[in-house]
């Protein structure tokens, strides 16, 4: 049986998925990873637990199909350090919408 080298990868990079950030908990920076199945305009936004928008990491930029990594440095849209706590990161790519929680610990 023929086995492709990428058969051992846990995620098919051509499926829509929002993965766990790494590290989590984090301080001062974390990586947010996602994969999309086709070229899409992507939005990736960070919210606090009150639902307030904290930071926009991607605002409608076009991404190709595959696996992508975006860094967040724990700063809000004004460049200020955000306090310790739980944050939600939400992706929208075409009709795909997903969110996950992450924990910033100082």
Regions found by a protein language model. Give the residues of each.
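Conserved small/polar residues in nucleotide/adenosyl-binding loops
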Residues: 1-5
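Glycine-centered coil/turn sites that cap beta-strands in beta-rich domains
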Residues: 6-22, 26-47, 56-59, 69-72, ...
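Short, surface-exposed loop/turn motifs with a glycine/proline- and acidic-biased composition
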Residues: 58-94
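Extracellular and select intracellular beta-sandwich modules with Ser/Thr-enriched
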Residues: 96-100
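Short beta-strand edge segments in extracellular beta-sheet folds
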Residues: 102-106
